[in-house]
């Protein structure tokens, strides 16, 4: 484990580098305008520090790259699939495993098997693609995160927790037969990368059992959640990360995972089912026409091998300590400068409170997105909005959803940037904050009907 000295440095050596392109302010003003003021539509070559997402952006280890050379590209029965199954079974304790090309592929396969039209999926706080797949399957996603998550200024160790009283009351009101399943997202991205405590998971399991409802996990950042439990929850300080993960998932019936986060790979996802063989059979039947045969699920053998090795590597406590503390390093710099963030910082990103940063910009004009545009113009930094733009419209009313939390997410890729990059990011945010009164909101030029933030085009409100 780290001592105070070694905590200051990354616990790895850099073997390969990629040059970063430096653009001028004038070029960035032109480029973002050409992209319709949508940072998703920028070319990556025109981005200096890319904090858009931690999904698929990790730097793989030499051990993972070595595994890539052992890819068994057989259509059926790949040895890399067998290795992946063994690793998942060992870490999570789930019997049945199928790979998918990424997390949303897992949701697209699994959710229609679990959701009947009009049923509710109760989560701590669903992310955008998850909520979209719930709605595409005919369901309704309901967020049940604790009220403390909405208070960005004050400390709470587990802001990703379910409000268990609200959860049970909702089930009583709507009837258990109208609940498709409960989905625990660990860590809770939309709340600020915030962890869920073991005690809360246990209580959600108790409620699920009481009403005969299944509990699934969105396990994209499972190891980061386990690290927070070890650091913050009494009784777990002396347990290994692997032991904590095993206990967490013992309370679930299955999980979907974007392996592009904590499995430290650039592509891949998983569906794992604890012991329901009948559901596993249905998953396989759905998987084949959509993702590919059961033993590859849209992935090359080499990618499954890298995923298996990444799942093992992410359990290293030294890595996790550095990872979480790099996020904290950036968050502390911003907080010390008076910039409003979700406090404490979460596992994969620093979340700036856009409504407090730009109180003069109405939420319908996407204040957090406006900050993202200004960060790119200021320093070539690409962040992402997790707020009203991402939330989309209510399918019943057609009105913009206006979430209580409206964030700029500074998402830190794993094993990619040093704290020198974080210093640049902090300075850029401070400069934007200093001229915040001059920043205007945005409106649509083109608005797609689904997941609009990916391909929308916008313009400043004059």
Swiss-Prot record:
Highest taxon, organism lineage: Bacteria
Recorded catalytic activity of this chain's protein: L-tryptophan + H2O = indole + pyruvate + NH4(+)
S-S bonds: none
Residue positions where N6-(pyridoxal phosphate)lysine is found in the record: 261
InterPro entries: ArAA_b-elim_lyase/Thr_aldolase (IPR001597), Beta-eliminating_lyase (IPR011166), PyrdxlP-dep_Trfase (IPR015424), PyrdxlP-dep_Trfase_major (IPR015421), PyrdxlP-dep_Trfase_small (IPR015422), TNase (IPR013440), Tryptophanase_CS (IPR018176)
Cofactor(s) listed: pyridoxal 5'-phosphate
Gene Ontology MF term list: tryptophanase activity
SUPFAM superfamilies per UniProt: PLP-dependent transferases
Subunit structure: Homotetramer.
Record NCBIfam families: PRK13238.1
Protein name (database record): Tryptophanase
Organism for this UniProt entry: Caldanaerobacter subterraneus subsp. tengcongensis (strain DSM 15242 / JCM 11007 / NBRC 100824 / MB4)
